[in-house]
């Protein structure tokens, strides 16, 4: 049975609502680093543009947004799993860090935890300093992450992995991570 765009959008909204109830730490972690994960490319010394790749259906959240720029690429233009035949959507905040937090992407909401599938197929959440082009103090300083944040993030990603496209993407990223480093920390 094909899911409608409206049903997909409602599913994403429910995920957003769950993740809105938890935070990695008990304070605004952006105060530790100047919100580097939101404003990284606003520093003129950086040539990379900070964009986030969206998960399938997440692009529907940005239809009416003036604060985010939504664009897409053909899946053949970048290294993505072969199962992704359609366009890959990307989003960029137009005025970081002053974006509409109510529609920030799942990757922002679950940061700094990263989904990872081990070589034997087990699902984990990991912390990986090499994953980002900037330093996150939570990872660097080995700060304790709230248990409820870990639990909800794990449950959300576990559910998202039931989508074969999401599974293939996380699996590909996990294999790339395993080739790049073994120095990531399994959180759960």
Identify the meaning behind each predicted range:
Residues 1-188:
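Short loop/turn segments that flank or connect secondary-structure elements
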């Amino acid at each position: 049975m094909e899911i409608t765009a409206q049903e997909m959008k409602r599913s994403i909204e429910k995920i957003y609502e769950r993740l809105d109830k938890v935070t990695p730490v008990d304070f605004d972690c952006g105060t530790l680093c100047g919100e580097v994960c939101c404003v990284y490319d606003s520093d003129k010394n950086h040539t990379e543009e900070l964009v986030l790749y969206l998960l399938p259906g997440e692009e529907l959240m940005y239809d009416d947004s003036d604060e985010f720029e939504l664009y897409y690429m053909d899946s053949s233009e970048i290294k993505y799993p072969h199962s992704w035949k359609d366009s890959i959507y990307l989003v960029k905040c137009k005025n970081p860090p002053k974006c509409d937090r109510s529609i920030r992407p799942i990757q922002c909401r679950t940061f700094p935890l990263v989904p990872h599938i081990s070589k034997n197929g087990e699902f984990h959440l990991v912390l990986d300093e090499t994953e980002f082009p900037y330093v996150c103090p939570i990872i660097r300083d080995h700060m304790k992450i709230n248990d409820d944040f870990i639990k909800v993030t794990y449950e959300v990603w576990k559910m998202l992995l039931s989508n074969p496209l999401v599974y293939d993407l996380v699996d590909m990223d996990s294999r790339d991570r395993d080739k790049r480093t073994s120095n990531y920390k399994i959180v759960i």
